[in-house]
Amino acid sequence: MPHRTQRYSKIGDTMKTIDLSGKWNYKTDIDDSQTIDSIKFENNNFNLPGSTCDNRIGKKTEYFDKISKEAVRAPRERYEYIAPLWLQKTVSIPNDTDGKTVRLFMERVNISSELWIDGVKTDRQIIELSTPHIYNLTGKITPGEHTFTLKIDNRNLLNLDTMASGYSVDTQGYWNGVIGRIELQYEEKEHIDSIQVYTDDKGITLKVVETSDVHSPFKTEKATVTVNVTSPKGDLLGEKIFETKVFNSKQVDYFRYDISEMNYWDEFNPNLYTATVKYECNGHTDIKSVKFGMRTIKTENKKILLNNRQISLRGTIDCAIYPLTGYPPMDIEVWRKNFKTIKSYGLNHVRFHAWCPPECAFNAADEIGMYISVEMSLWLNHDVCALETGEDPIHRQYFMQEAINISKTYGNHPSFIMFSNGNENMGDFDMLNDITTCIKAYDNRRIYTLTTNFDHPIMPCEDYLCAYEAGGHNVRIQNCQDKAAENTSLDYSSAVKDVPVPIISFEVGQYCVYPDVDLIEKYTGNILPVNLDAIKKFMIEKNVYHKLNDYIKASGDLAVKLYKEDIEAALRTKDFGGFELLSLSDYTGQSTATVGILDVFYESKGLISHDEFKNFAGEAVPLFKAKRIFKNTDTLEAELDLYDFGEKKINNPVYNLTVQNGKQVFYKTSTTESKVSIPLNSITKSTMLSVILEVNGYKNTWRIFVFAENKIENNVRMIKSEEELDDIIKNGGKAIVMKECFKNPIHGSFIPVFWSPVHFPSQKPCGAIIDNKHRIFDDFPTEKYPDYQWKRLLDNSVGTDISKFAGEVKPIIETVPNFFDNTASSPLFETEIGKAKLLFCGFDLDGDYPECKQLLSSITQYVNSDKF
């Protein structure tokens, strides 16, 4: 027998619900051949809310035998099912539903639903990704037992292609089912249909949609609307009563409520008010409440103004990757945890990348004070998809309605401050412009842009631009890494000058951190990490699995350094709108893009603490602008600055600057001046200096390198030909073997793989591991992992596969390979071949720059000593 246990609850005064969660009968329909008349239900153990994967329905996913592009594409659902699914349940409808408004509410469905009651089709098919599926059953259902039949179809019915985070194997997958609340709702015909709260600097305007039994132009009903507002502390601010006349079955009224002493909502004080509306009409009363925050947002003079105060967005991206469920969490505690984690790293903003999260995510963001940007599941351009925006005519109508639905459903949330139609769209910008113009006119409670990414002429409806280029200028470091390596002064002021709206730097970072294949054991839910398993097998095959932790730490250290520079470039730019990282946490799709400081479970990889990260990504960040590399005959000229977007402005900041040489203080000052000059001529040995700048308790650090005059040992033999190499091997001696003799050379790079070595094919490595205690570095300052003194050296280097050498090889510098290569290569290593003692050096030591000359000096002194 079907499971009929139902739970009843009340919302407000009149609305009741019947909980339809629990066991449903189900039937698969792989070839979409079933109809309501032919379908036969044989199973009664499908649990809702839940997905087919939750219920172990579909083709079981197996691990791949070996690495391949397909194997590392993304983790997969343990059970894959992409087809219609039929669900059925007998529901007991109570007597008090008679004459009432009745709805079936399903909080989130992927991607379409159809409903039959007792075999009769009810309403149209609903295709909706971002908001609840709601069926109006008023007048279509009577008290007693009824059979509800659902058809859920997760096929690509909207021609979305495969990229948008709301519908992609790379992100949340193609799950089939119903998640969140599933319930029957019923209430009097005279009820409040919706409440929208519009805030300004004097109070609120309530848009209330009231329903009634008025269906004739010759009939009206008198109604009373009473509004109460409760403060964030729970104090009742007062009651206002409005008399109105109802002319339609669904009527819109606007009511004004002024608030004299406001507690604004923002990242520091996420104050939430409650508006309670009582609607009395035709002898019936309905009471509904809505939480809201007193906040306004606009852009003006290239600034984003929240509550008339400039804000700066420090964000990360959520791409709908949730490996335990395989679909968005419908539990507010998950969102609270994630947002608190993000905030602990100094960030205040989350962009939902080509998807819209569920209600509980907004609730958590409201509570915690997180600024949210929402997008539709729209990502179409010919660079990555078969379609461009607008090529499918259904998209204009669908996405216009989708934008309205998102605004209606989530628009009251103060955290919801930004809206974009989608990610990296190209094609019909007339369509995007029409949608944005209409939705902005419909709801002015947030700021808007046509699409996230791609430089373009700013439309009148656009409030900001989020892109990696703006006005023809770079606004992320990816394409200006050489300049960033020279100094800590890079900014995007030229872009700000040329673009009329605030600029947000798009998807900053994307630096590949070697994937932690031991995370496989964390995947205890619906998602099978086939990609990590394939990479692990490949590591074992290449005999590098034992180096996993070293690879993660080295590549992660480099990623942290580069993220720091990317972030600080944005912070240095006056009136810059902000940045959005890709990403604080890993992206596991698109060929395994493990680019995060956190893993996909929002847990630390141990690369940097949240407090250390916050030092350069938080609300107030001291900034030190200077060259990175000096000669000891130079003077260090630096500019001191402060990025200041904390709750309270730091007026007349005092800069406490300390420069350390090892444990010794080399220079120290406390000043209100923005410029300092530090002579370096007292430094006699090449060294790394640590710079610590503190302002009002906020601290930030940098490293700079000072090179003293170097001594070159000219009597060291340097071999550049095979003939010379054969000679020394045969006759004996010691020498440096230069890169001209490297067989099958592997080109080096300081900057690691971008995103994924498979998604964007690349042979680049992901960092290096340096034996910094080796005597070869007695006169060259370095730590275990390279800093910017290695940038030009590594970019002009080659390595070779040291596993191919027959004898013992002692790597001094070991390259961290990318996971699709896993070659154990080195640009600097020692070995003995025949009678020769050799140092293989893949660096170009002829460069006319300080760090190159110093490395040459340090290497030649080592080779010419008895230490070699």
Identify what each model region corresponds to.
Residues 1-68, 151, 155-156, 184, ...:
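Accessory carbohydrate-binding/adhesion or oligomerization-edge regions at the termini
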Residues 18, 24-31, 55, 77-192, ...:
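Accessory beta-strand-rich segments of carbohydrate-active enzymes
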Residues 57, 62-92, 100-105, 110-116, ...:
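Active-site-adjacent substrate/metal-binding segments within catalytic domains
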Residues 142-145, 209, 213-298, 674-677, ...:
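Extended acidic/polar, glycine-enriched regions
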Residues 342, 349-599:
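Substrate-binding/catalytic cleft of secreted carbohydrate-active enzymes
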Residues 442, 741-744, 756-851:
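Catalytic beta-strand/loop cores that center a nucleophilic Ser/Cys/Thr
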Residues 582-644:
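Aromatic-rich peripheral "rim/lid" segments of glycoside hydrolase catalytic domains that contact
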Residues 716-756, 835-837, 841:
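Short alpha-beta junction capping motif
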